[in-house]
Amino acid sequence: MTFGGLDLFMTQKTCNFGFVKIDLIMPLNLNIVEQSIVPPFRQIINQIEESIRNGSLKSGEMLPSMSEMAESLGLSKETVKKSYLILRDQGVINSTRGVGYFIASPDSNRKKRVMLLFDRLSIVKEVIFDSFASTIGEQAEINIYLHNQQVELLDYYVRKYLDSYDWFVITPHFPLDSKTQRQVLTILRRIPIRKLIILDHKLDNLVGNYGTVYQDYATDAALGLSMAAEELRPLRKLNVIISQSSLYHAYACQSISDFCKANKISCVFHSNVSPRIVHAGEVYLIVNGQLDMDLINLVRAARAKNLKPGKDFRIIAYNDSPIREIVLDGLTTISTDFEQMGRLAAEMILDNTPRKVKCDFRMIRRGTF
């Protein structure tokens, strides 16, 4: 249902106010949808920004006065004022006393404002951030926030900062139950599609031309292991260390099980490492996020049995990071390319070309395999 509409053409005239040249012809067609989840002030902002992008509005063209806009759209003057002030603060429009608001000249020196909303800090997130920041350079101001996999925090940050940033880059890692996922989608839909980039996890139920750079938890583990299928088949067993509390436990286990079944490899899943599961001639894939503790327990148990990693038994870790190049003379990993993830997200912002890209996933061979 359309609540109000504005189709306004002002008299053609060019005026000079100091250094400001203003063209008083301004074709503008706005429609406010009453039942939209997007509030009216945000609808005004979105439509003016879209008119600038598609060339309907150009630098120097006047906007209607607040009173004219409010009357034509059937809104309060305060609603229109809120839209104009936000657009002015963002550098989209300017104002001159006694004249009104007009479309600002493009400011090539203005830095883009980017919110990085991660679930938690980790070595992997640091790799993503470093790559993102080095690619985007001095062209953006970046602020990091954490939602800690809590929907309430996601909602809080989106509500509070929706009008403060040009781009929102979000890792949507939340519990996978249907209720939580519906809440997440509802919150994310408040963000204008053109400002949104989803990282690390693809949201199939979120439609639109937003950007996403993701890994596929349902297939990637099998893809990585397939790169060493010939070496894995002769070994006695693949031991997978993965906690049942892991967010994507079911996806990873299914992917690994499918690989082992297809390649006739014996596979056993464990929630942690104990000395009784450590044997010569076997492989240990550590999927748990707390790699350090599992790795320490595995190496301790192996040393007690005079077993050397890479020689008497093999170790593969899930997810790569710089420290894994050094541990045990190099820890073999299967991993998404997190540097690529950060770089591609930054390039989407720099080029203003959101798209959907699956990151490369590979095995990085080092000393433990």
Can you describe what each PLM-predicted range is?
Residues 47, 280-283, 291-369:
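Flexible loop/turn connectors
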Residues 200-239, 294, 319, 334-354:
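Hydrophobic alpha-helical segments within soluble ligand-binding/sensing domains
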Residues 42, 66, 89, 101, ...:
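Amphipathic helical "hinge" segments at domain boundaries
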Residues 115-116, 165-176, 197, 238-243, ...:
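Periplasmic-binding protein-like
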Residues 220-261, 357-369:
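An alpha-beta-alpha
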